[in-house]
Amino acid sequence: MSVAKRVGAALAPHVTQIAPNLSAAFVHQALDKAITGVGRLPGAAAAADKQLAENDGDLDRGTHDVIENHVRYAGLQGFATNIGGLVTMAFTVPTNITGLALIQCRMVAGIVHLRGYDLDDPRTRAAILTCLLDEDRIKKLVLPGTPMEIASAQVFDSTLNTTLTNEVASELITRAAGKRLATTIGRRTPVVGGVVGASADAFVTWKIGRYVDREFLPRAGRQWRKRR
């Protein structure tokens, strides 16, 4: 673990100091908006279906485009919220956390929708939240299974929702706090700070997308065509 991430992990419990007025509830709000859509941003299923149609029904290519689009969104969102230099740094963290959560939830939801999972199913939603955690952290947590196993479970444990919400909120805040430390020097030149933040957000989003792509197999009835 990097120095920045270790410091971020230490700071994460102090949510009110890092991101005032932010609570774990923002995770569910981000997930809801990601699935239903917000403003001019269509919901996850509609956006994913469009990518699938543009690739002539090829699920592999459609999934690839969903990931690539959201990696770009994450980079742009990170750039926008990390510009401004040291003076505005304390005020941009909540926007960065909530915006990135929405982008990543939308990407994961789009992929699992293409694989045949119902986005209104609480099991699917719990699996989506699980995917926002670092892959190594998922392996260390005491969970009833992998994200795909959670989405496919015969019985849903409602207490899992609270556990996952808190874990995801902590993880997102840890990343943001660690990134703040890592980019402080860069922020003395605001554009440099923006580029560093954009790159970090895009890379984490790409890692999550690749993990989801590997983790979720198409459900029965979904035709799977690999790219040639």
Feature map (PLM): residue ranges:
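Structural signature of FAD isoalloxazine-binding scaffolds in flavoprotein oxidoreductases
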Residues: 99-107
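Terminal, membrane-proximal amphipathic helices
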Residues: 1-79, 106-228
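Short secondary-structure transition/capping motifs
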Residues: 64-68, 93-100
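Conserved phosphate/anionic-ligand binding catalytic regions in large, soluble enzymes, centered on
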Residues: 77-98, 191-195
